[in-house]
C-alpha cells in the first residue's frame, strides 16, 4: 500500500470512529434525559401494549388524581407524602420535599416527575397541579380516558386546599 492510500485510509477510519463516538455520546445524553410518562396502573402492572414497567431508579413522570385523605405532612419540614390514583384503580405513593403548588389539593389532577425509588413509590422532584376545575394535563386526560368527574368538596376540604 502506497503512503497516499494509507493516509486516506487512516483519515477515513478516524472520521468514521469520530462520527460513531459523537453518535454514541448523543444517544447516551438523550437516553439519560428521557422522562417517560406512566399512569399509576402502568407503574404497578406495566403498559397495556408492551407490558413494560419502569425500573427502580428510572426517571419518570406520573399523572393521576391525588387520593382524598392520603396526604401526610411532616410538621417539622416541607416533606409531604400522598397517593395518586387513576381510573383503572392503580395507586402509587409520591413523596415530595419542597413547596407544593398553590392549586394542589386532594382530589385534583397532578403530574409528578421524579425517580422511582421502590415498586409503587415515586420520589418527586417536581409536582405540577392542574389550573382550574376543568383543566387536566393532556397526558393525564389521555391516559385516564378523560373519565374523571368534577369532585364535590366538603367545607373542611375546601379550607384545607386554601379555597373559600
From Swiss-Prot:
It is found in: Cell inner membrane. The chain crosses the membrane at residues 9-29. Residues 1-8 are cytoplasmic. Residues 147-158 have a biased composition (Basic and acidic residues). GO terms for cellular component: plasma membrane. GO terms for biological process: cytochrome complex assembly. The keyword Heme applies. Keywords: Cell inner membrane, Cell membrane, Cytochrome c-type biogenesis, Heme, Iron, Membrane, Metal-binding, Signal-anchor, Transmembrane, Transmembrane helix. Heme binds at residues 131, 135. InterPro entries: CcmE, CcmE-like_sf, NA-bd_OB-fold. It is a single-pass type II membrane protein. Residues 30-164 are periplasmic. SUPFAM superfamilies: Heme chaperone CcmE. Residues 140-164 are annotated as: Disordered. Its main location: membrane. GO terms for molecular function: heme binding; metal ion binding. It comes from the Bacteria. Pfam families: CcmE (PF03100). NCBIfam families: PRK13165.1 (NF009638), PRK13254.1-3 (NF009729). Heme chaperone required for the biogenesis of c-type cytochromes. Transiently binds heme delivered by CcmC and transfers the heme to apo-cytochromes in a process facilitated by CcmF and CcmH. Belongs to the CcmE/CycJ family. This is Cytochrome c-type biogenesis protein CcmE. It comes from Shewanella piezotolerans (strain WP3 / JCM 13877). The gene is ccmE.
